[in-house]
């Protein structure tokens, strides 16, 4: 690869030299008339310069042009440079040193002589080493060095040309003659230079080809040597591998032989074991076969004996069958005779009784049916009486147990809330300038503020407990902060609304947690919590619902009913009271619609809508809900009424019952929940007592308004008195 690069570099340099020579020749031929003098050999000798370059300085409008000849390589010791005389440079004649200035140097012969150099000579007369000599490897480097040196000398000559031309012009007296001589010799010299360059290029190319061929031959020899060595090594490795493979094969064969011997011994042992086990199994099988053969023989003996017995039994059965056939014929004959006798007797009875058999059968059925109905009626009456007694007793026990197990605190609430103040001066701040603050508070909250002489207290009055609670929280926040003005009132009112809403949600969640009910719609939970601020006859509705849920759960457990369903229905039965001021209608029906809208079951919805008999109850859950509602709301102290209305209601109840004829005395008992009417037994019989109780109850329902139920009891007592003397 290095040889190829050197060859390519040499070719490039040769092309550059040829181009330089061609440009110089073209410039010389194109200049025309103006040429300036050249330095002669005598001038160079007198100036002391070493003549290694023959330069011709030409000058015209385009500038100077220089023809560069290769420099003369210094001769080695004992070697003469090529030329006509010793010490002559390449392309120079052997003129004497004292030649005149005007005599031009004949150059053509020297170029002709240089056109055919000896095979071993270098360019410019220097000897060239023969191919294969020790200097062969550095020939290309010397060629490049020679070309580079010539180029440098040419450039130096060009740089030195103006000074030499000036000196020549000053010293030369025959410039016109030299100019004409140079003009005549220029074409010949150009052709000589071209031929010399072509010969040199041909020699360099030939030498490069020889070097390439020699290097290629050398590379081929080295490759052959390497191939031979590789084949030897491969053969050696192959032999070694064969030897190792043979050794491994022998070892493997020995190992296989040992393994085969071990396996053979193991197989022999296994075969011996298998043979032993097979012989043992064969003995066992033979013993089993002998046992089976004996069993089969015994079984065949039994079968034969049984077959003989069956044959004997079959013969006996055949005899009995014949006997039965005979008896059957006899019975058929007797049956026919009996039927004839029965027909004769029936005809005689019909004639005597004057009734047919069908009529007698119908009369008998009618008699039996009448007796059965009488007995059934007596039995049903007895069962009903017992059921009423047991049912009433059990219901009383269940209700009593439920009431005893539920002990809930109840505090009545009014429509007025008292807010304590830190001082009486706060009342003036609440009123504000010209009553601005109190008017703003009442218009924003809808709660009336009552300020009287009560020390350190104001009253908040509103029939809506929710609005009253929002107003209380708003006023308490204003009093604690101290800043009371309309804008502040609106801010605190908005904050109080959010707080009350959160309290409602929390109250609903607490109610669910207390009653053990889960998975309820969030809207139902919110509505349930809003009942915390609702009252019914002074009783808190949410507390009433929680108490009703506990009562319904206890009664459902006593009756072995679904406990969660009863609790859920009782907890939601007054849900409509949270919306009664927003939606028209009964709170029972409103609550049922809301529960149905939010995914409650139909049993719960029916219990809600039927707890005040707007819809007839159709399930035990609805009845339990009614009972729990009545127990929670009807117990003494649960609900309150004003004393005046309470007294008037009791008086009117006694008056309604006392105005009836035959009534002796009337007692309103259990805070008006029960009325006992004592009648005169001579004037009012049992039927009239029932009518009196119904009429009194209907008149009370029509004229009075009361919570819960009122029971009317008419007592008719007959006394018989006897005196023993």
Curated annotation (Swiss-Prot):
Gene3D superfamilies: Hypothetical protein af1432. InterPro entries: HD/PDEase_dom, HD_domain, HDIG_dom, KH_dom, KH_dom_type_1, KH_dom_type_1_sf, Ribonuclease_Y, RNase_Y_N. Disulfide bonds: none annotated. Pfam families: HD (PF01966), KH_1 (PF00013), RNase_Y_N (PF12072). Keywords: Cell membrane, Endonuclease, Hydrolase, Membrane, Nuclease, RNA-binding, Transmembrane, Transmembrane helix. GO terms for biological process: mRNA catabolic process. It is found in: Cell membrane. The chain crosses the membrane at residues 4-24. GO terms for cellular component: plasma membrane. Its EC number is 3.1.-.-. It comes from the Bacteria. It is a single-pass membrane protein. Residues 62-140, 165-195, 300-321 are annotated as: Disordered. GO terms for molecular function: RNA binding; RNA endonuclease activity. It is an enzyme of class 3 (hydrolase). Residues 541-634 form the HD domain. HAMAP family: RNase_Y (MF_00335). PANTHER family: RIBONUCLEASE Y. This is Ribonuclease Y. It comes from Frankia alni (strain DSM 45986 / CECT 9034 / ACN14a). The gene is rny.
